[in-house]
């Protein structure tokens, strides 16, 4: 079985051919009787998922859900406080260290970092929610220029730590949880974590 965060297919398909890498990959799995499970949004939203792991990695305390799901206690993004306020430069260095990134992109709104909103993957659409939650800084990925401009001039520091960089911390946690569940269920199975290559990186 292959467990992934991102699905290979996002849009519905009517047939599968070998004309695209996505279809070829899934056909290879089918031919070799390999099941594929892609968690994606459910893992983003659930308590203990992508955003909780990201918030914990950064060191946020007293975290709350940034964008609550309808009818549930979970949802997208988290917002919490640092143990001690710091400058954006200091916080940026912290982000690079804990997420193991060589580079990040930051927009400086001139505020010290104390209350931080995070959304793993692509969460730039939630700038208004971050501001409404009282955050002074927002960490996410896939930030466009005009989105960053809106954040900075609205008084919100913004950090693009890349889509991949903000989600990768979840992988080892997920593998450990699956291994524990298998062991407690009496299954003799090995959980292997694939070496992740960075799709986009500074050269």
Kindly give the residue locations of the regions a language model identified.
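Active-site catalytic microenvironments in core metabolic enzymes, especially phosphate/sugar-handling
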Residues: 1-203
């Amino acid at each position: 079985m292959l467990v992934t965060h991102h699905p290979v297919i996002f849009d519905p398909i009517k047939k599968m051919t070998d004309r695209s890498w996505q279809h070829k990959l899934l056909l290879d799995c089918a031919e070799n009787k390999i099941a594929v499970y892609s968690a994606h949004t459910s893992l983003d939203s659930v308590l203990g998922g992508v955003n909780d792991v990201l918030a914990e990695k950064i060191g946020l305390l007293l975290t709350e859900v940034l964008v609550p799901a309808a009818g549930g206690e979970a949802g997208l993004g988290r917002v919490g406080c640092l143990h001690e306020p710091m400058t954006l430069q200091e916080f940026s260095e912290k982000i690079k260290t804990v997420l193991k990134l060589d580079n990040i992109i930051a927009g400086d709104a001139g505020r010290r970092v104390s209350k931080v909103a995070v959304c793993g993957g692509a969460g730039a659409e939630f700038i208004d929610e971050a501001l409404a939650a009282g955050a002074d800084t927002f960490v996410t990925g896939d930030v466009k220029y005009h989105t960053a401009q809106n954040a900075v001039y609205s008084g919100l520091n913004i950090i693009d730590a890349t889509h991949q960089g903000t989600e990768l911390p979840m992988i080892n946690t997920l593998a450990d949880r699956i291994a524990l569940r298998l062991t407690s269920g009496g299954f003799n199975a090995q959980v292997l974590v694939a070496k992740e290559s960075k799709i986009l990186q500074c050269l």
